Curated annotation (Swiss-Prot):
Protein family per UniProt: Belongs to the ATPase epsilon chain family.
Name of the gene this protein is made from: atpC
Domain of life: Bacteria
Gene3D superfamilies cross-referenced by the UniProt entry: F0F1 ATP synthase delta/epsilon subunit, N-terminal
Family annotation (Pfam families): ATP-synt_DE_N
GO CC term, one of those recorded: plasma membrane-derived thylakoid membrane
Transport keyword on record: yes
Function: Produces ATP from ADP in the presence of a proton gradient across the membrane.
Family annotation (InterPro entries): ATP_synth_F1_dsu/esu (IPR001469), ATP_synth_F1_dsu/esu_N (IPR020546), ATPsynth_dsu/esu_N (IPR036771)
Name assigned to this protein: ATP synthase epsilon chain
Keywords from the named record: ATP synthesis, CF(1), Hydrogen ion transport, Ion transport, Membrane, Thylakoid, Transport
PANTHER family membership: ATP SYNTHASE DELTA/EPSILON CHAIN, ATP SYNTHASE EPSILON CHAIN, CHLOROPLASTIC
Keyword Transport belongs to the record: yes
Subunit structure: F-type ATPases have 2 components, CF(1) - the catalytic core - and CF(0) - the membrane proton channel. CF(1) has five subunits: alpha(3), beta(3), gamma(1), delta(1), epsilon(1). CF(0) has three main subunits: a, b and c.
């Protein structure tokens, strides 16, 4: 028995297919989903969705959003997403360096919108790197 999985971003259908198992980065931690899962809606954090089909794992970098789980169907609506195998690791690593440089300009306790933006960019770059390497 398989789960029907759809990952949708505003400008594209990122992934549509079946999976035996799905692991989502929810805002409260990793959420493992198997066929017959209880119905729920959850917020998705910046992180990596992992799906298993035929003993093969595939990773998708997610940039925050929501997921709806209904028994054997998972619909993930995100701000943006990239399939791990399509991510250019060098570009993601460069984005991480730039975000870390941007954050180094602020003190540890400083609250600034630019610092918050840089922290978010670090999370995005790390998710992209992790998805690309898995």
């Amino acid at each position: 028995m398989a789960i029907s999985l759809k990952v949708l971003a505003p400008n594209k259908n990122v992934y549509q297919g079946e999976a035996e198992e799905v692991i989502l980065p929810s805002t409260t931690g990793q959420l493992g989903i198997l066929p017959g899962h209880i119905s729920l809606v959850t917020a998705i954090d910046i992180g990596v969705l992992r799906l298993r089909m035929n003993s093969q794992w595939k990773s998708i970098a997610l940039m925050g959003g929501f997921a709806e789980i209904e028994s054997d169907e998972v619909i993930v609506l995100v701000n943006n997403a990239e399939i791990g195998s399509e991510i250019n690791v060098q570009n993601a690593e460069q984005d991480l360096k730039e975000a870390k440089l941007a954050i180094s300009k602020f003190s540890e306790n400083e609250k600034n919108p630019e610092k918050i933006k840089a922290l978010k960019e670090i999370s995005k770059a790390e998710a992209r790197i992790q998805a690309a390497k898995n």
